[in-house]
């Protein structure tokens, strides 16, 4: 990152965390920023590592926990549940190719993972009333589509496939409070 006070003169670029880690879908919760950051090449793509990071200012990041070193996990989103638990849904790059669902208690130190049976790239969570939804790219050999699923009991139940062309990843979800 770089900083400026006038929009014309900028500081020297500096990293906010270790080189090689990508901060993915940063979330704000209880006065801090969080990201499930991953290293895509460490030392090889098969050795990916996903870490939960925390920041007070969004610029300087510290390690909370290592979530996983398995299944070539990468792009992920976080969701804090009313019971205090934390959920993470992450894209995987192994042969199975389905998204992995991780759960932890409020301390976010120990994570338990389970395959969902559904490929979800670039996942994003949203809660509406007492229901949890996830959107992302469903990547298949015959083409990619953007989908919305309801997330129930660790599984993705398809709600709708959106008209899709090209790279259909990186969706966002906005819940209308009315």
What are these regions (language model features)?
Residues 1-167, 175-178:
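Beta-rich carbohydrate-recognition and catalytic domains
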